[in-house]
Amino acid sequence: MEPNSPKKIQFAVPVFQSQIAPEAAEQIRKRRPTPASLVILNEHNPPEIDDKRVPNTQGELQNASPKQRKQSVYTPPTIKGVKHLKGQNESAFPEEEEGTNEREEQRDH
């Protein structure tokens, strides 16, 4: 370090030590399944195990693979439904109505 340069603070960083024993950490790692192993296990389940299975809870559904989740299909609103909603909310969008009235007047000219 040069004599005229500002002094830099150096911190002594202790070596990271896990709060649990390495053996315990290894046991936890072995017990905890990875997403890939879950998919492999689910593909190779014998049928009799599937019959005894309890319905999934909400938490289990979030962890399920995309194939196992119920696929929802987007249904766009119909023209009839949009017109019905717009008819109900006409007072809710006054600026939108003004814009349509102005466009209609321009078409008439």
Swiss-Prot record:
Residues 45-54, 100-109 have a biased composition (Basic and acidic residues). Residues 55-75 have a biased composition (Polar residues). It comes from the Eukaryota. GO terms for biological process: cell division; intracellular signal transduction. One of its GO terms (molecular function) is protein phosphatase inhibitor activity. Keywords: Cell cycle, Cell division, Cytoplasm, Protein phosphatase inhibitor. It is found in: Cytoplasm. InterPro entries: PPP1R1A/B/C. GO terms for cellular component: cytoplasm. Residues 25-109 are annotated as: Disordered. PANTHER family: PROTEIN PHOSPHATASE 1 REGULATORY SUBUNIT 1C (PTHR15417:SF5), PROTEIN PHOSPHATASE INHIBITOR AND DOPAMINE- AND CAMP-REGULATED NEURONAL PHOSPHOPROTEIN (PTHR15417). May increase cell susceptibility to TNF-induced apoptosis. Belongs to the protein phosphatase inhibitor 1 family. This is Protein phosphatase 1 regulatory subunit 1C. It comes from Pongo abelii. The lineage of its organism: Eukaryota, Metazoa, Chordata, Craniata, Vertebrata.
